[in-house]
Amino acid sequence: MAKAWNVPGLLQDATFRDAAGRVVVTRWREMMSFRDGTLAGEDIEQLHAMRVSSRRLRAAMDAFAGAFPGKSFRTHLRVIKEITDTLGAARDLDVAVDGLEAVVRDFADIERPGIEALVAEYRTHRAAEATHIAALFTRLDEAHFGQRFERWVARHTGVDPGGLQTQPEDH
């Protein structure tokens, strides 16, 4: 699992709003850093890391809900939940396929065709989920959601996202 990014400039005496801005933007960027790998679909761990990061973002938003107006907060949180849920549906299928492939050799020859058919069905569903993920991110891109999200955070917390040098911990 991907390690959570450090939050740049988060000081012990930070105001609630300053901390909210820094943490939420960092978690957003952390999640989005896995986007290309998730869309490529070549490594299921990219999707897993993106989903874990989306859950971190949701937790951060819940923790800092008081820094944002209720109606716009709910609107933005709903989009983040949609991302998490969409990724979760694909992740569940990845886990199921991995699990079945790991044990299929342990079954009697007579049982294997049924398991292999189930794996094939899950792969078909997983391909459909990949299409849903791509469509979701296309829609978010067309709506400029990422830029709007960061501006919304800045407007309500005073934190300038452009000044945050967010990156994975190993950099």
Language model feature labels by segment:
Residues 1-171:
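Cationic, histidine-enriched alpha-helical/coil surfaces that engage anionic ligands
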